[in-house]
Amino acid sequence: MFFRNIGMIEYEGADSENPYAFKYYNPDEFVGGKTMKEHLRFAVAYWHTFDADGKDPFGDGTMFRAWNRLTHPLDKAKARAEAAFEFFEKLGVPYFCFHDVDIVDEGATLRETFTYLDQMSSFLKEMMETSHVQLLWNTANMFTHPRYVHGAATSCNADVYAYAAAKVKKGLDIAKELGAENYVFWGGREGYETLLNTDMKLELENLSSFYRMAVEYAREIGFDGQFLIEPKPKEPTKHQYDFDAATTIAFLETYGLKDHFKLNLEANHATLAGHTFEHELRVAALHDMLGSIDANQGDLLLGWDTDEFPTDLYSAVLAMYEILKAGGFKTGGINFDAKVRRPSFADEDLFHAHIAGMDTYAVGLKVASRLLEDKALDQVIEERYESYTKGIGLEIKEGRTDLKKLAAYALENDHIENQSGRQERLKATVNRYLLNALREAPAGKETH
């Protein structure tokens, strides 16, 4: 065992001072007809939790995990997996996520890498068969190794393109074997630094072909999981092709791929794109493209992807409001693509961080559900757009008018009165619901 001094993390209620207990996340509590566990579908990110060592551009790693001390790739990978499943079980999460290089280091050749992956896939499958934990999604890392300096599916080098395709093929084989509910593409190197040396048209066409081949291969092997694309505007590449939800949806529509994909949206990526997280969620939902989320938060004083654990209750409320309005998760869930801070190097910090994130989204779920149940925000919106329910507004909405009719109407109705947007009232309403939820939270486990 790697976490000998830590037991099962259980729900103890809002008054608990136990740092190894949930205060608000009660997996069995019903909210809006489903349990919290069914709504939230929490997942742990393998890379940040078990691979990361705290290294940053200015300093060496600070996190010396016992499971990463072995030298042989497979020995280390198996120890890491044992630590991971001990963590999953004690935390009580139903899912995990990984990149291929997270579960085992690359070998000296692609063939050796695949041999390692085959052995580790079998090892993980055995562990999953004796556990309640399942695979939410997996993906191929096509951004870390120097071979991807010019991209993977958008590389100017066809040999790199073929190598990346081989990695995705193996990734889909693993997804099929482990019963993944989704498969993710994140194009960290799919973009460009300067147009001076870039054939954008060719790169976008090659990228679309890459996705199409993945869809075809999945169909061939019988993998029926949901394909997801994770937008990000920049970092590590200056201009990334999957900039945000709208850009990614436009790309998929342009190349006839929209029916095969949904989006995996990350809060910190929305920040980098100049959007709120709820904006990205709303855009995806409007196009029936909301698949899953990576839960984290950024630091507005910094300009990069800090991947902090989500503790902002207000943001979690607004995110869950959009998710519930869209019908909730189907194959997706809430993956904590978040890392403990570099000075938080103790193993127990991993538990504290996930407990905080899970409690945050539990509060977000309860408040959002109550807002929707009470239709607390609906009245203001209905009043604001009331002019489109009758007269000329209804004609506009139903497409029964034209510029000439509208011009004639405007000439006869040029005394215009607008109504208040009531932003402050709405924000106060959200605050009230949030504070009430915290006030009403059961003090102890026995209270329901």
UniProtKB/Swiss-Prot annotation:
Which Pfam families does the UniProt record give? AP_endonuc_2
Q: Does the keyword Magnesium apply?
A: yes
User: Which Gene Ontology cellular-component terms appear in the entry?
Assistant: cytoplasm
UniProt-annotated catalytic positions: 99, 102
Q: Name one GO biological process term.
A: D-xylose metabolic process
What EC number(s) does its UniProt record assign?
Answer: 5.3.1.5
Query: Which compartment or compartments is the protein found in?
Result: Cytoplasm
Name the residues that bind Mg(2+) 2.
Answer: 266, 269, 305, 307
* Cofactor section: Mg(2+)
Q: Which UniProt keywords apply?
A: Carbohydrate metabolism, Cytoplasm, Isomerase, Magnesium, Metal-binding, Xylose metabolism
| Single GO molecular function | xylose isomerase activity
SUPFAM superfamilies on file: Xylose isomerase-like
User: What binding details are noted for the cofactor?
Assistant: Binds 2 magnesium ions per subunit.
Per UniProt, Mg(2+) 1 binds at: 230, 266, 294, 337
Q: Which InterPro entries match?
A: Xyl_isomerase-like_sf, Xyl_isomerase-like_TIM-brl, Xylose_isom_bac, Xylose_isomerase
Q: Which reaction does it catalyse?
A: alpha-D-xylose = alpha-D-xylulofuranose
Q: Which HAMAP family does this entry report, sorted A to Z?
A: Xylose_isom_A
Query: How the protein assembles, per its UniProt entry?
Result: Homotetramer.
Stated family: Belongs to the xylose isomerase family.
Stated name of the protein: Xylose isomerase
**Organism, as annotated:** Bacillus licheniformis (strain ATCC 14580 / DSM 13 / JCM 2505 / CCUG 7422 / NBRC 12200 / NCIMB 9375 / NCTC 10341 / NRRL NRS-1264 / Gibson 46)
Q: What is the lineage of its organism?
A: Bacteria, Bacillati, Bacillota, Bacilli, Bacillales
